[in-house]
Amino acid sequence: MVPWLEPGEPFPDTRLALTDPDGLLAAGSDLSPDTLLRAYSTGIFPWYDAESQPILWWSPAPRCVIQLEQLHVSRSLARHLRRADFTVTFDRAFETVMRTCAAPRQDEAGTWISEDMLAAYCRLHELGYAHSVEIWQNGALAGCLYGIQLGQMFFGESMASPQRNGSKVALVALRNFARKLDIQLLDAQIENPHLMSMGAEMMPRSAFEAHLQRWIPSQPAPSHWPGDRFDWPDLQAAHQAF
């Protein structure tokens, strides 16, 4: 059993999270900006099936993270990046990105991105905490991701590939701008083969939470991402110049 939280109640100590299922910490509360910011600041995130479950809060251990400067770009992906004619934008289509990530996929029975989740994260986007990366090719969305930046941490929430390798390209684009955005570490939450192939690693909860304490101020300010459009060669050059 996990504790039931009323809105505004503090989260339990993450060391009390279950090991089966791994990381389940609490249920209840709400998806208000204050609740979400308090949760992410301590390494807790919501993940649940809105059709059959209350809001569930998680803190898995170990934690899947990506040190963006060590992101692995395979030879095939590098060739794809050289050949493709991509345009990259940040925060130009946040709701579209979320809805794209919420679309049904062949290997999944459904989506955890409900309308309530969409509304909550769009509100965080309006407040300057949630952000998106969009990859465009021939005017269509080819890949995307979104997440939350608090201080020097980026908490990745979801990514999608409407076109081949699109989410990988979005992750490389985020890597290319990480220095300018002052992002030190990407929280990928839960291990999966796609992320591990790009250099993700599993970090003990104690080490992960030490990074949170170091890189997230007690009152994290909104972050402002670039509003320009970037052709892929320009973004690659910008990464090398930072």
From Swiss-Prot:
One of its GO terms (cellular component) is cytoplasm. Keywords: Acyltransferase, Cytoplasm, Transferase. It is found in: Cytoplasm. It holds the Pfam family Leu_Phe_trans. GO terms for biological process: protein catabolic process. Its EC number is 2.3.2.6. Its main location: cytoplasm. The keyword Nucleus does not apply. GO terms for molecular function: leucyl-tRNA--protein transferase activity. Belongs to the L/F-transferase family. Functions in the N-end rule pathway of protein degradation where it conjugates Leu, Phe and, less efficiently, Met from aminoacyl-tRNAs to the N-termini of proteins containing an N-terminal arginine or lysine. PANTHER family: LEUCYL/PHENYLALANYL-TRNA--PROTEIN TRANSFERASE, LEUCYL_PHENYLALANYL-TRNA--PROTEIN TRANSFERASE. This is Leucyl/phenylalanyl-tRNA--protein transferase. The gene is aat.
